[in-house]
Amino acid sequence: MLNYQCLETDSYCGTSHIELDGIHIYIDPGSDDSLKHPEVPEQPDLILLSHSDLAHIGGLVYAYYKYDWKNAYIYATLPTINMGRMTMLDAIKSNYISDMSKADVDAVFDSIIPLRYQQPTLLLGKCSGLTITAYNAGHTLGGTLWSLIKESESVLYAVDWNHSKDKHLNGAALYSNGHILEALNRPNTLITDANNSLVSIPSRKKRDEAFIESVMSSLLKGGTVLLPVDAASRVLELCCILDNHWSASQPPLPFPILFLSPTSTKTIDYAKSMIEWMGDNIVRDFGINENLLEFRNINTITDFSQISHIGPGPKVILATALTLECGFSQRILLDLMSENSNDLILFTQRSRCPQNSLANQFIRYWERASKKKRDIPHPVGLYAEQAVKIKTKEPLEGEELRSYQELEFSKRNKDAEDTALEFRNRTILDEDLSSSSSSEDDDLDLNTEVPHVALGSSAFLMGKSFDLNLRDPAVQALHTKYKMFPYIEKRRRIDEYGEIIKHQDFSMINEPANTLELENDSDDNALSNSNGKRKWSEINDGLQQKKEEEDEDEVPSKIITDEKTIRVSCQVQFIDIEGLHDGRSLKTIIPQVNPRRLVLIHASTEEKEDMKKTCASLSAFTKDVYIPNYGEIINVSIDVNAFSLKLADDLIKNLIWTKVGNCEVSHMLAKVEISKPSEEEDKKEEVEKKDGDKERNEEKKEEKETLPVLNALTLRSDLARAPRAAPLLVGNIRLAYLRKALLDQGISAELKGEGVLLCGGAVAVRKLSGGKISVEGSLSNRFFEIRKLVYDALAVV
């Protein structure tokens, strides 16, 4: 049974709920800037994360604590985990989220299990029998297409993917070199987005040229360029484009590039540490190009006050958030985008901006005002007054501060009590384990007779004495009291690999990464010794300063929201560098994937209807195309009667296997029977019941009761009643490979298009819908020779 339920909102944020044979799978619990997630109908058993932006992970932390998702397995790629952590921390600070802390985010993301690309993972427990595999999506660093396989059901979840290469990413694994990846071809159910199905995007070269042209035009006129960006995903592509252009320009450009985000420095550091996840061009140049991903022309700023040190003049500012309704991008809009008409707000992403957001309103204004004579219209002037909501943070005072302190005091007391109780229970458990192990050793000594020796002699101490076990229980229960301080030495835990250690005891003290270099050369020399190395005291001072900055952020404060009317006077433009497919590629690739069921999500109603209409016009494509509404449950199970059977040993020995691709198949005549345990198995079960685990024995018993056995036919009556079938040809012939085989045999072959291969000028091999192949031609030796080559390319079962 395979059910799908769409829980996404109008802004394309939300969760996909898949129920596969009783396993509840939630994919991409996204949210908007509020970081809230709606209540879900069922508790998840498995959570999968595709990308690291808010639309795919924004609601994870909220739902993890609010709806108690702590028992679910969470899987993602390593870049999605690291960049997703940065995205959440940026959103918390930009939106002044008070009910969510950095510790909450770290606890959730530390519980995520990392996966590598094309690493099949067989799950256990409640998800037993389910295999998940991650494939490159090409949209974000670590972005994922998820393949789910359980018995006869196969699901491909492909949302937000990009088939073309970026500056720092490869294209999606779904479509490479003009072919669909064999492992992702013909799934039972394909869940994908119809985003941009109505749009034809210009070539990447044209878009990059228009992007640089617009940026440089504004800078040369004395304007400032504002690029609203996300915190940790597509911003890396913009950094690559800008840094490459600044590095290649001669003479060097005098315009600074600023990356404004509370997590900008850590985002760049994470990107440098995950080069193996990037595109082939990045991996190829690693170790050769010293400036690879150094972004020497980009200054990271984590505090808005540092902008005052830059000074006036043209500059490029990449600032979070995308919507212009919070974060540094809103503050830049308020402070800088109302004075100079040469200033430019350049949008590069649209699908992540909600319909009612300020960014989306500006993009729609640009579309109405621009002339559509060019592929990429020029910027247009925006002169308007706009009402915006501004959040400010003010420290608590008076009665509010006292109430806050009382609440925090009660929380700390409760946390201390819980910690003490947990420590006490753990200590009791350790003592019980220690006493039980010692009592087992004592029990072994009871049956051994010891010769009479003097009490206290070395012979008595070295031997085994019955008197040693006669201990008073009251005395044994007393604990040792320490007069100086209550230090309790913890038990050393040892497993098969050795002693278990704490990694934090051996961690190195790393020097904090530098952000914007505001000091001049003389200050830098003063901070260095003669060898040019930092002193240990300076590193400690830096760590202490960092700690003080974190403490400043923890000052009790309240959030005040005011509505203010601002004046905007600047240029506006949208250039698509979002890294997503367009309508042409979508309508070309999806028919080649050729799924048995297609579910369209993550797009507007017009885009989904257009994609459905395109699929309906294809004669060889499935007619089972679904567009689910919010909360609607649709059944996308395939019409296959699949059963789990156990093959008898005698049957396996006589099977003849034929290799088909990476698999082997065999034809058999067998009979399904209910297994009856033999006398030896009964005796073995009795021994296991006495010595083994009760739960394990019950599982084995249920498995034997539920799995019938497939036995070979031995009776003549069974053989006479068995159905007879013609030989079955199994496999997939590619006409290009067949053409090569024909040419090797000296037979001319020419591809005529539309799945037709003309052989020897007289025989045509045609691929039909449904995987059928026809060989047409006059009966001759050449016809049978070609047919034999076709048979040889298939497995006869």
UniProtKB/Swiss-Prot annotation:
GO terms for cellular component: mRNA cleavage and polyadenylation specificity factor complex; nucleus. GO terms for molecular function: RNA binding. Residues 519-557, 677-703 are annotated as: Disordered. It holds the Pfam family Lactamase_B_6. It comes from the Eukaryota. Transmembrane segments: none annotated. Keywords: mRNA processing, Nucleus. The keyword Phosphoprotein does not apply. Gene3D superfamilies: Ribonuclease Z/Hydroxyacylglutathione hydrolase-like (3.60.15.10). Residues 684-703 have a biased composition (Basic and acidic residues). InterPro entries: Beta_Casp (IPR022712), CPSF2 (IPR027075), Cpsf2_C (IPR025069), CPSF2_MBL (IPR035639), Metallo-B-lactamas (IPR001279), RibonucZ/Hydroxyglut_hydro (IPR036866), RMMBL (IPR011108). CDD domains: CPSF2-like_MBL-fold. It is found in: Nucleus. GO terms for biological process: co-transcriptional mRNA 3'-end processing, cleavage and polyadenylation pathway. Component of the cleavage and polyadenylation factor (CPF) complex, which is composed of cft1, cft2, ysh1, pta1, swd2, pfs2, dis2, yth1, ssu72, and fip1. RNA-binding component of the cleavage and polyadenylation factor (CPF) complex, which plays a key role in polyadenylation-dependent pre-mRNA 3'-end formation and cooperates with cleavage factors including the CFIA complex and NAB4/CFIB. May be involved in poly(A)-site recognition. May be involved in the association of the CPF, CPFIA and RNA polymerase II complexes. This is Cleavage factor two protein 2. It comes from Schizosaccharomyces pombe (strain 972 / ATCC 24843) (Fission yeast). The lineage of its organism: Eukaryota, Fungi, Dikarya, Ascomycota, Taphrinomycotina.
